[in-house]
Amino acid sequence: MDGESQTSKLSCEHMYSWYFTREELEKFSPSRKDGITEIMESEIRQLYCSFIRDVGIRLKLPQMTIATAIMFCHRFYLYQSLAKNGWQTIATVCIFLASKVEDTPCPLDQVIRVAYGTMYRRDPATARRIHQKDVFEKQKALILTGERLVLTTVRFDFNIQHPYRPLLDAMEKLGISQKEVKQVAWNFVNDWLKTTLCLQYKPQYIAAGSLYLAAKFQNVKLPVHGGHVWWHQFDVAPKPLEAVLQQMREMVHMKAKLFAHPSPAKQKEVLFEGMLLISNSPDSVLTQSSLSVSSSSPEIGDPNDHLQVDSSQDIVHIEDRSKSYPERNLSNLTADMNNPGKTHNKESLDQALKIKHGGLISCNQQIPLDAIAKIDSSTAKCVEQNIGICCSSSNTFNGKILNPFSISQRSGDKTKLCSEGGSSLTDVDSKSTQSVEPPTTICNHTSDSLNVDSLCSDQRLANSTAGTTEKASFVLPVQIKVDHLCVERKKVDVARIKDLLMKRKRRRERQGRCIPSVDLSEEAWIERELESGIVFKKVDHVVASYDLSDEGWIERELESGIVIGQKNDQPVSLDGLTEDDWIERELESGIIVEPGPAGKKLKSKLLSEGHEIMNSRWEINGKSMQNQVT
């Protein structure tokens, strides 16, 4: 029985395995049938990973939730084509789904609004359309449809493991206290999350490879724990670990070569047909015209007027043509592979990404792979030891515990990226680039969003005169128009309020005049007094007591004034009286009613007679009480 159960368990693991070889991922990708090459798919993978990261930061989601959303997106496109499923929609769905899986729920309405605003952050007019009911309901229905598709595609498998925990546990067991090693290893894990390594190897292999490269980069020897080598702490086999390290080195070397040979940026942009194919495929499973780059929907308008900008795209305008750097550089990269002799006339993708956000490396960009020096597998030496990349990294540490949810701020005006030999590849000064950017910005810069809303700084690669002039002419009229309308509306509101206050003041002045009460009815007088202020009307005429009934006289006297007599502190007792007699006695002895000035003379006779009656009654009561006592 044990053998059969173990066999069934292994078969189930194989059936629901999410790990494939590198050849399987490249050969059997469903996007290949729709004309999307491996390079295109890799570039789009970087786009939706950056988009998920930016939206997650805006929603203040923890790092684990963001990583889970990225893994959901990776697994979805293992079985679905990029050309038939818009990655913006799928990425938004994965964020919403990951927030529920990781017990960090975020309202669907908020996810939709933030994701839509992130997609159209360069075009505030289009981003504000999400507040319209019809646009919002359309996006909501699209996200709910996409959620069902993602759930069925990933087979309702929510068990996702990340390399963060194995990495932290191993560093704690090995006693690694160097913050630089921890930071570089953590950033490596985040970098591999944007590649297919997380679809090829289990998390402990990625954690082990990241720690090894970080130690070699910092020239730190990994210690031995309990008589075992360091990689035993990850429970990994040496042969697969060597394969993981080989792929990591290849990616590092490829990035280093791209940065080592930057190309000039003065060239004409060519539209990227692959991106248009993704959004406009007639066989799309999720049709979302409002999210497509070249949408012809009347709600969005001409795509050239407000081209959709993704989380890692930056718009430049040269010769009246809108083009994003990731698209342009991807087409240039493909052309360079076909024409090696024309490499000097093309611009690489990483040259644009290298100076993104003013040359500053934000926390979620992590330490770029190009900053890692070439690691020789035979010698395992670090070419450059004193490189200052970790200073600009984002994640912070508290003692020995690495906080995966921390978000750091900018850390300086300059960041140097080094290649082979430790030479500086770029030195971007934030002060020198301020003159290139237009003086009026559409987006707001906030430290919490970590440059999510910053203007594109890839203009520095383009012509500093023509490109900046066209960019400024593109931005300034919209901003000035909006400010002008706001000022006009404020003026109208102020004038209307002042006019209303003046009318009210004049009306109160008219109402404040003395108007005889005899000329007004009771309702009119009450209305006048309520509007001008409550004034108690005095009774000037005298009403004779004999003209009033007993109830009327009592009511009048109560209105004219009641004087409370001395307080009776004696204990309450009936004193042998009936209840009615006792109440009458207490009322007469405790309350003294003073008549108004108009009826004092007329009431004096009645009061004297009343006293005589009360005295006689008291005498009778007193005798009866004495008789009862005796």
From Swiss-Prot:
Biased-composition ranges, Low complexity, are 288-297
User: Quick check: keyword Hydrolase in the entry?
Assistant: no
Q: Does the keyword Transmembrane apply?
A: no
In terms of domain of life, where is this protein from? Eukaryota
Q: Name one GO biological process term.
A: positive regulation of DNA-templated transcription, elongation
One Pfam match: Cyclin_N
Would you tell me the Gene Ontology cellular component terms? Answer: cyclin/CDK positive transcription elongation factor complex; nucleus
Sorted alphabetically, which keywords does the UniProt record give?
A: Cyclin
The record's listing under SUPFAM superfamilies reads: Cyclin-like (SSF47954)
What Gene Ontology molecular function terms does this protein carry? cyclin-dependent protein serine/threonine kinase activator activity
By its UniProt entry, which InterPro entries does this protein fall under?
Answer: Cyclin-like_dom, Cyclin-like_sf, Cyclin/Ssn8, Cyclin_N
Record-stated family: Belongs to the cyclin family. Cyclin T subfamily.
Q: Which PANTHER family match?
A: CYCLIN
What's the protein here called? Cyclin-T1-2
Q: Give the species this sequence originates from.
A: Oryza sativa subsp. japonica
